[in-house]
Amino acid sequence: MKSKSFERDLSPEKTEAILDGAMQEFLENGYAAARIDKIAVAAGVSKATIYRRFPDKESLFTALMQQLACKKELFNSTQLQFAQGDVASFLKSFATMMLNRVAEDPQTLTFLRIVIGESGRFPELARAFVQNIEKPMLESLTQYLASQPELELPDAEVAARAFMGTMVHFVMLRDILHSGDLVPMECDRLLDNLVKLIIRPV
């Protein structure tokens, strides 16, 4: 039977504190240079407590991705699952929401830069990002488009990838590479015409 102290170590409050401390450490020092002992200090727990909940640094980083996807709802696939009404209006509002949330959250942008920057040395981090964030979103968007027979899409998955890929490219230029002024494009113009390409296939 587990002791009360052990149960307290695994409490939701301590888990949240660990994740907050980990986010702070990863954002300040990147993945490779991040240290568990500094995370423990920031979280106000022992290293042993962290290892009881997260066996290694990779599992801790993956948990942060899951938190990013769920808690902040930056990439919320649930909205796609329960979408109703006009397809064009919904797609634009959905895309606008995603782009705005990314742009308005510096912490998320820094986290994305870490994933991209560390992907060469730690490909498992990039794969975890795709598994926890990109894949669910792509699958949900594919299902949504496939459920709209009036669109007469030849391939819903290709359409979903084109839609998501355009937004990812926009974020990369504007927010990650700091080059929105070099290749300017108004968000409304981009999304209005992107939606037209999707709902009016050639």
Predicted feature locations:
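Amphipathic alpha-helical segments that line or abut small-molecule/effector binding pockets
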Residues: 20, 85-104, 109-113, 157, ...
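Basic, helix-initiating cap at the start of DNA-binding domains
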Residues: 1-45, 52-53, 58-59, 85
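Amphipathic alpha-helical packing segments from all-alpha helical-bundle domains
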Residues: 123-150, 189-192
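Amphipathic alpha-helical linker/stalk segments
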Residues: 62-94, 141
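Amphipathic alpha-helical segments used for helix-helix packing
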Residues: 102-131, 172-177
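Short, charged helix-capping/linker segments at alpha-helix termini
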Residues: 32, 150-154
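Amphipathic C-terminal alpha-helical segment
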Residues: 100-104, 143, 160-182, 197-202
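A short secondary-structure junction motif
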Residues: 67-75, 105, 122, 140, ...
